[in-house]
Amino acid sequence: ATSPGQLMVPANLTVLLKMATPRRYKDSKYMESIAGDIYGGALRGSPELVHSYLRHVRWSSDYGYYLQLLAGCGWTSLPWLRLLAQPTLVMAGTDDPLVPFANGRILASLIRDARLVTIDDGHLFLVTKARESAGMISEFLS
C-alpha cells in the first residue's frame, strides 16, 4: 500500500490525527483501540492480530518517527511516474484507511507498464496476508 507522496488522495482527517503521534507504538492498549481505524482490514476487531503485529515492530525514537512524517509531507513522485518503463506491480488494499485504494489506481494509471493487484484487506496486507501477497509477487516476477 503506497501512494505517490504528497499529492495523493489523503486519509480521513481522523486517521491522520491518530498518525500524528507515535503513542500507538508505546501503549499497546491504545494501539489496540485504534489499529482498525488506521490500518483497516484484518486488524479491525482483532486484538490478537494487533498484538502479534506489535511483537514484530521495533520502536526507534520519537525523533525518527517525526522525521518519517516530515519526509512524507514534502515529496511526490507524480511528475516522474510516466518515466518508469519497467514492469511494475502495484498492490493496494481495498480497506486501507491510511492510504485509500484510489492511490493504487493513480499509480497504476500513470506508470506505463503497471499491473494493479487488489487485496481484500487493509494497509498491512503484506503482514496479514503474507503468503497470498508473496504468491502474487512471485507470480509477477516470474
Residue positions per predicted region:
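Catalytic active-site module of serine/aspartate enzymes centered on a nucleophile-bearing elbow/loop
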Residues: A114-S142
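Acidic catalytic loop of the alpha/beta-hydrolase fold
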Residues: D95-V99, L124
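Short alpha-helix in the alpha/beta-hydrolase fold that links the catalytic acid
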Residues: Q86, P100-S109
